[in-house]
Amino acid sequence: MRLSVFYIFITRLAMTKNATKNEMGSKSPNIVALVLPLLLILYTLSSQVEVVESTGRKLAFWGNPIVWTPHSNSCGGSPASVFASSKWTTGRPCRRSRPPGTNIPVSDQSP
């Protein structure tokens, strides 16, 4: 809210200076009147950007590629955590280990 009021004030001030110069006979455009509002808009937009953390998949650019991904509903699908983990054993392909804290019985899961 404060930035929008400041933007209106700067725009009005620049327009007043530009009109005053035109009355005095100067035909050159005021560069500050054009650049300053654009810089203010750019600053306002860049301040609205926030860092959002992922809650579903935990990805990393360094270290281990993928810490955990949810399992696939199909029996033949292999999540990426299987390829990143060295503890995966061949056995029943439809039952995979769950991450800690998700102790849901297999019979209650929907297909």
UniProtKB/Swiss-Prot annotation:
Positions of disulphide bridges: none
Tissue occurrence: Mostly expressed in leaves, and, to a lower extent, in roots, stems, siliques, seeds and flowers.
GO molecular function: LRR domain binding; receptor serine/threonine kinase binding
Keyword Secreted among UniProt keywords: yes
Subunit description: Interacts with MIK2 (via extracellular leucine-rich repeat domain); this interaction triggers the formation of complex between MIK2 and the BAK1/SERK3 and SERK4 coreceptors, and subsequent BAK1 activation by phosphorylation.
Name listed for the protein in its UniProt record: Secreted transmembrane peptide 5
UniProtKB keywords: Apoplast, Cell membrane, Cleavage on pair of basic residues, Membrane, Secreted, Signal
Its biological purpose: Brassicaceae-specific phytocytokine (plant endogenous peptide released into the apoplast) perceived by MIK2 in a BAK1/SERK3 and SERK4 coreceptors-dependent manner, that modulates various physiological and antimicrobial processes including growth prevention and reactive oxygen species (ROS) response regulation.
Keyword Cell membrane belongs to the record: yes
SCOOP motif, short sequence motif: residues: 66-79
Signal peptide coordinates: 1-46
Gene: STMP5
Organism: Arabidopsis thaliana
Motif segment (SxS motif essential for MIK2 binding): 72-74
Intracellular or extracellular location(s): Cell membrane; Secreted, Extracellular space, Apoplast
Induction: Induced by pathogenic bacteria Pseudomonas syringae pv. tomato (Pst) DC3000, jasmonate (MeJA), ethylene (ET) and salicylic acid (SA), mainly in shoots.
GO cellular component: apoplast; plasma membrane
Segments crossing the lipid bilayer: none
Disordered: region residues: 89-111
GO biological process terms, semicolon-separated: response to bacterium; response to ethylene; response to jasmonic acid; response to salicylic acid
Family: Belongs to the serine rich endogenous peptide (SCOOP) phytocytokine family.
